[in-house]
């Protein structure tokens, strides 16, 4: 956010020295409202030319795409060409597209007078509120919007007629939601995109600068900055965090960059509360899209876990969490590519050290695992992704036991596999749940515990399943330790523990 006002020209030096921008990593944001001669070239070719130009000439690896086609909300069918080319380019160039989810207009399908009562339920009942092309892209990061303020701007002599639709840190009334391709979590993140208000005098949705965000203008003749509302203004925040991470770790892959951002994100409490408060009325259940229904003992109920994660994904990325470790919060990174990539229908096993001091610390302890991979894709197949990956965190077993079980089941179909271990030995990784998590190429789960007596090592088992591609698969892992006990210096404990690698790395 920009809080300084300038007169005259703003130079690059002003931006870095006075506004506090922290990175000069090359990233590209499209600020032209319409491409020059856009109708003379297919959008697929335009995307490829843009990437080739900025990658070849500037080494640009982060592309912010605050554009989309409102005519094509994702409808669970085969993805369109614009979506596919983003996935292909990211795998080919090891770059990252960060895409806005698109803006939803409630008035197209509903009576505007009902918006205050209908918000946020309409996201889950209206299929046209889904993310638009190309925001369903499997490898891109998609960003939805949340409200910046609860207080509309009102002039001193103006009658108060503007009512906020959303409160601060709640989901924006004009964002769009998932699911994405093959039920994947979309959007993955949310950021401040502002919101409009409901004007009680005019009975219409109106703009209000009190809840707008400031960004670069896409009208070059009107100055450098502008203020407006929409997910187009939320996506650049995530792009900026990605650039800071890339400046800190300049040689990391697209996969590790995405995994770090996921590990640094959390769902705002205000949005969690919004979902919790939704009533399971029969009328609401009947209107829900199929994705958000579940059968509970013969009764149809709202699946609030899916509602939350298809609304906000993994939440709001926090800058410091993405770029640094702390005494009570530490990230371990693994960028598994090239010769370290995983073969299809095989496993990799990682030893996760559990220091005694961490296990015995007061309060809650958390181990968060984030996995990202960039499979080859094919628009013409029912299985869009060439491979699927997943992970489990095992405790209370030796490395040899884990190795033997995983080796015996490598390459088997899911229905042929037996349960690896009793449930008590498999960490209950929360958040969205295993099934929902595994639909996407960016996965995150947290194991939270207060007491444990399962030994000094856990084992992270990573699986790669062939859908139709036989190529080895690059991927990345981030394992984050977090402890509430301020007396436990987990950073130093882990730093000393992992200097010498131990155990088998893969099966």
What is the meaning of each model-derived region?
Residues 1-18, 226-246:
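Active-site alpha-helical elements of protease catalytic centers
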Residues 249-275:
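An often Trp-containing, charged/polar helix-loop segment at the C-terminal end
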Residues 131, 384-413, 418, 422-425, ...:
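C-terminal edge strands of extracellular/lumenal beta-sandwich accessory domains
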Residues 1-75, 261:
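Subtilisin-like peptidase catalytic core
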Residues 146-235:
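Catalytic-core environment of secreted peptidases
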Residues 430-453:
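Beta-sandwich interaction modules
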Residues 285-393:
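Secreted peptidase-domain scaffold signal
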Residues 64-66, 97-102, 143:
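Active-site neighborhood of phospho(di)ester-bond hydrolases with catalytic His/Asp-centered motifs
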């Amino acid at each position: 956010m920009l809080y300084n006002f300038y007169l005259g020209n703003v130079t690059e030096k002003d931006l870095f020295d006075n506004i506090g921008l922290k990175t000069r990593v090359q990233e590209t944001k499209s600020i032209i409202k319409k491409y020059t001669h856009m109708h003379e070239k297919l959008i697929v070719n335009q995307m490829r030319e843009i990437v080739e130009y900025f990658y070849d000439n500037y080494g640009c690896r982060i592309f912010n795409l605050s554009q989309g086609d409102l005519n094509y909300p994702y409808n669970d069918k085969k993805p369109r060409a614009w979506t596919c080319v983003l996935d292909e380019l990211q795998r080919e160039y090891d770059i990252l597209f960060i895409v806005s989810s698109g803006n939803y207009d409630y008035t197209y399908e509903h009576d505007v007078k009902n918006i205050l009562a209908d918000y946020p339920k309409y996201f889950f009942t209206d299929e046209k509120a889904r993310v638009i092309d190309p925001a369903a892209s499997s490898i891109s990061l998609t960003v939805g919007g949340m409200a910046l303020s609860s207080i509309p701007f009102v002039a001193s002599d103006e009658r108060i007629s503007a009512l906020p639709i959303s409160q601060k840190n709640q989901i924006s009334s004009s964002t769009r939601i998932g699911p994405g391709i093959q039920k994947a979590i979309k959007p993955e993140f949310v950021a401040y995109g502002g919101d409009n208000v409901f004007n009680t005098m005019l009975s219409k949705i109106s703009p209000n600068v009190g809840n707008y965000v400031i960004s670069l203008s896409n009208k070059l003749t009107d100055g450098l900055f502008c203020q407006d509302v929409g997910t187009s203004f939320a996506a650049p925040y995530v792009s900026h965090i990605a650039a800071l991470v890339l400046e800190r770790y300049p040689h990391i892959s697209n996969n590790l960059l995405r995994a770090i951002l996921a590990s640094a994100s959390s769902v705002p409490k205000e949005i969690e509360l919004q979902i919790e408060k939704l009533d399971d009325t029969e009328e609401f259940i009947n209107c829900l899209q199929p994705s958000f229904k579940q059968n509970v003992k013969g009764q149809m109920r709202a699946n609030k876990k899916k509602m939350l994660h298809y609304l906000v994904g993994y939440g709001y990325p926090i800058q410091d969490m993405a770029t640094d470790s702390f005494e009570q919060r530490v990230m371990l990174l693994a960028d598994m590519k090239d010769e370290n990539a995983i073969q299809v229908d095989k496993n990799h096993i990682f030893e996760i050290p559990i220091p005694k001091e961490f296990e015995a610390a007061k309060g809650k302890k958390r181990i968060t695992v984030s996995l990202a991979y960039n499979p080859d894709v094919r628009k013409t197949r029912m299985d869009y992704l060439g491979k699927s990956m997943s992970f489990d965190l095992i405790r209370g077993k030796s490395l040899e036991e884990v190795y033997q079980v995983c080796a015996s089941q490598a390459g088997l179909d899911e229905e042929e596999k037996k349960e690896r271990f009793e449930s008590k030995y498999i960490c209950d990784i929360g958040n969205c749940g295993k099934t929902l998590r595994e639909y996407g190429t960016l996965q995150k789960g947290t194991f939270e515990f207060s007491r444990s007596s399962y030994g000094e090592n856990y084992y992270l088992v990573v699986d790669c399943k062939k859908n139709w591609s036989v190529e080895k698969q690059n991927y990345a892992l981030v394992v984050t330790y977090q402890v509430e006990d301020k007396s436990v210096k987990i950073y130093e404990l882990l730093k000393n523990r992992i200097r010498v690698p131990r155990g088998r790395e893969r099966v």
